[in-house]
Regions:
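Flexible coil segments in periplasmic/lumen-exposed cytochrome c-class electron-transfer proteins
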Residues: 24-31, 42, 50-80, 95, ...
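Bacterial N-terminal signal peptides
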Residues: 8-15
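Sec/Tat signal peptide C-region and signal peptidase I cleavage site
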Residues: 16-21
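Short, cysteine/histidine-rich loop/knuckle motifs that typically chelate Zn2+
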Residues: 47
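Local sequence-structure signature of Cys/Sec-based thiol-disulfide redox active-site neighborhoods
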Residues: 37-43
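Positively charged n-region of N-terminal signal peptides that target proteins for export
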Residues: 1-4
């Protein structure tokens, strides 16, 4: 009898939590979106595309994930900023997102070649996670050419060694 009561209470609490999440307008994450969330974490996407992520040891509210950063990355290529991927995904279809992952050669320090070499299913899963997360934040600052001085803060990369 006690076991039945404990199970019934657990189910009631779980059902209440699910109902409250539904009332708040939170939608259930699909298996593909969950996989995309996992890939985002293990591939290090948050390291640059989520402000404060590395500094906090990854303790940034998920509502802020992948909203870009105002920290610039300055080197011989100019100054680049990590894009707000949640806004980028809102502007693209899934097919366009995959095509961009395959064809874009982005400026450093973005490891575009890692994204290019991901399996289509992984890129699609990331897209589905971004769509699930929805739009948030502001667009990243615009690229600054090498001959222009960027506004701080930025990380200064040294020039490559001369050959």
């Amino acid at each position: 009898m006690k076991k039945t009561l404990v199970v019934a209470c657990a189910l009631a609490v779980a059902g209440t939590g699910a109902a409250l999440a539904q009332q708040k307008g939170e939608k259930k994450m699909s298996a593909d979106a969950q996989r995309g969330r996992y890939i985002v974490q293990i591939a290090g996407c948050n390291d640059c595309h989520t402000a404060g992520y590395p500094e906090s040891g990854g303790k940034v509210d998920e509502k802020l994930w992948l909203t870009g950063d105002k920290l610039g990355w300055r080197g011989p290529w100019g100054t680049t900023y990590a894009a707000n991927l949640r806004l980028v995904a809102q502007k693209l279809t899934e097919a366009q997102f995959v095509a961009r992952a395959r064809s874009s050669e982005l400026r450093p320090p973005m490891p575009w070649f890692n994204v290019r070499d991901m399996a289509d299913g992984d890129v699609r899963a990331i897209y589905r996670y971004l769509k699930h997360a929805g739009p948030a934040g502001e667009p990243a600052p615009a690229y600054v050419p090498p001959d222009k001085e960027p506004a701080p803060p930025f990380v200064q990369f040294p020039a490559p060694p001369k050959k």
